[in-house]
């Protein structure tokens, strides 16, 4: 085999192996991210939202915290009894970015709160964001 042909084949193989390794690392990183989110969702987000929900329910508000079985997202809905509108806040994975996207929808507006790395999703963060959301919801009633 000619040397230039041999080198071309070896270069193509090396390029493939490099891309394949990068893809495998990307898949491992995504698995780590999804696993990390599953743990944070169960041990941080849901308990933090439930703590807020207890306080709101005691004050007469309807508050539902839901986590999908197949969908890894979380949704919290807060509304006053008999209200037609059911404002909600969601936590959804942005797998391409390895972040969690938080959206909020109230009677007046719907917009992303932002995208956050897993290490930003703490109990304090979750409760602060849902409190801001509730403040908006409460101010729009009446």
Where do the language-model regions lie?
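Intrinsically disordered, low-complexity regulatory regions enriched in serine/threonine/proline
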Residues: 1-25, 108-142
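Intrinsically disordered, low-complexity regulatory segments enriched in Ser/Thr/Pro
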Residues: 3, 77-128
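Generic hydrophobic, helix-prone segments enriched in Leu/Val/Ile
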Residues: 6-13, 65, 88-93
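Contiguous, amphipathic alpha-helical segments that mediate oligomerization or scaffolding
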Residues: 15-59
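Amphipathic alpha-helical interaction segments
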Residues: 24, 45, 69, 99, ...
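Generic hydrophobic secondary-structure signal
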Residues: 45, 49-52, 56, 76-78, ...
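Ser/Thr-rich, low-complexity intrinsically disordered terminal regions
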Residues: 61-84
């Amino acid at each position: 085999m000619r040397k230039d042909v041999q080198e071309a084949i070896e270069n193509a193989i090396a390029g493939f192996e490099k891309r394949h390794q990068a893809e495998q690392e990307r898949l491992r990183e995504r698995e780590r991210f999804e696993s990390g989110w599953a743990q944070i969702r169960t041990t941080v987000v849901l308990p933090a939202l439930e703590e807020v929900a207890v306080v709101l329910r005691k004050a007469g508000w309807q508050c539902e915290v839901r986590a999908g079985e197949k969908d890894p997202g979380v949704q919290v809905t807060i509304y006053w009894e008999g209200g037609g509108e059911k404002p909600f806040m969601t936590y959804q994975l942005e797998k391409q970015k390895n972040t969690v996207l938080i959206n909020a929808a109230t009677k007046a507006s719907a917009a992303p709160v932002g995208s956050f790395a897993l290490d930003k999703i703490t109990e304090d963060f979750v409760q602060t964001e849902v409190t801001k959301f509730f403040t908006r919801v409460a101010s729009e009633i009446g």
